[in-house]
Amino acid sequence: MAQHSVEMILMRQLADYLSVPVVLMDTTGTVIFYNEPAEKILGVRFEETGPIDRKEADRLVELSDDPAAASCDAGHPLDIALGERRPAHSHRLMLRRTDRVRLQIEVTAFPLIGQEGKLLGAVAMFWERPGP
């Protein structure tokens, strides 16, 4: 992560200590890190993938709106965090891994803003949603 800002490096360090699944994304949509709890849900270790560009991430993990979700839940929190520079939460998204396992998840994402208001990336925390 030598070419990343200090803030992004510190966020990666913090994510490594958290028990909640965390994905760290830069402004181009490249996943630059995900922690061990995220590996368990995503079904692949970060050591195996390394940083993942947006196209490859979409191939590895498919996110879609849950048809049962309310309209206020529409949208993907990471896209909102990066595009609108504000935090966002989705109560119901469907995640499908490359092994075809489908999980209903909740996602909270927020932008990382550096000095002078510069957008550095975004962080998503997510977890499997129990029940319907």
Language-model features: locations:
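N-terminal capping loop/helix in small sensory signaling domains highlighted by a polar->aromatic N-x2-3-F motif
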Residues: 35-42
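PAS/PAC sensory module
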Residues: 89-94, 101-107, 123
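Short, acidic, Ser/Thr-enriched surface-loop or helix-capping motifs
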Residues: 26, 65, 97, 114
